[in-house]
Amino acid sequence: MTTTRVCIDSSVALKIVRHCQESAPSIVAGQLLGLDVDGELRISHAFAFPQNAAGGNPNSDDGLSLRLKAVAKYQPEMIDHLKEVNVDSNSVGWYQSTVLGRIYNASVIENLAVFQEKNPDSVVLVYDVAGSEVVSDTDPSSTGPQGHTTTTPSGFNLRAFRLSEEYLNVRKSGKFDTATLTENNLTYHDVLVELPVEIKNSNLATLLLYQLGQQYPNSPFAESSFSNLNVSVDPFLEKNIEAIFDSVDDFHYDQGNYNYYQRQMTREQAKITQWQQKRKAENAAREKDGRPALPTDEWKRLFKLPTEPSRQDNLLISAQLNEHCSVIEEFGAAVNSKLFATQGGLL
């Protein structure tokens, strides 16, 4: 992996946002095309996948299946057509919409692993429909001399992710047990690596925005933001709290399965210890009688230890729970300020 940041052409970003917004609440996806230039992944084009590539249910944890026959047939055909018009045809990942940051599911992880096997620099661009509110800002400082704007969680929620080296190493071993996770230092914090996202305008678009800013300067009324006076609790925050409850339920269910495995393991190990002590006593008696000792490893044939369940689900659920908590921590500060201001009669 050589790229450390993602740069998206503004027209591509608008195309992604429009596709995701118009298809909401259905979950949709599309192909990303671009190049790796000096450690920067430049995304210059994108096109949508067929609608049936999506699960359709925004509340489902199943995510998208990008290996359907319709997608497998449509993707190469579309790339061939783009080659004919000299568009970058190098696949650098895919984009998809989501609701409430639900990206930590087996489908997203598996799709990303397949993409990174073909191109280690591949990423997934995630646009959160529920957490995005695209705001227009004509302040010249927001575009800058290079025409750059950045994404913020409180507004334009477009984020780039890639699987970490630790996760790929564990996946390569084929074992998601506790020993393998510990050996590779993999925790729920390290499943995905988030890359900084930068949106770049072309020089002509930057010039146009500058001219419009000079021609229609902001008035004091246009700069006012009366939304700050709204004291109602953000519905987005409420939905995240509900999502936390769902994630906690999933976590308890998965933890219950693991606790059952541990009880079974403890029970079997107690039986093995008892058998070994008995065999040790038998060998001591046989030694006194001058008879050969019995083998001490027969317990491997007599007892079968339970197999540890995969810890992948636990990793993903924990990571998703942490994602919801981070959102609440970020948005909760603003909501608490409004509530305290209301209580103090300041609004």
UniProtKB/Swiss-Prot annotation:
Q: Which GO terms describe its molecular function?
A: metallopeptidase activity; translation initiation factor activity
UniProt main location, coarse: cytoplasm
Write the record's keywords in alphabetical order, separated by commas. Cytoplasm, Initiation factor, Protein biosynthesis
Subcellular location as annotated: Cytoplasm
| Compositional bias (Polar residues) | 138-155
Q: Which CDD domains match?
A: MPN_eIF3h (cd08065)
Its family remark reads: Belongs to the eIF-3 subunit H family.
Please give the name of this protein.
Eukaryotic translation initiation factor 3 subunit H
Q: Which organism is it from?
A: Yarrowia lipolytica (strain CLIB 122 / E 150)
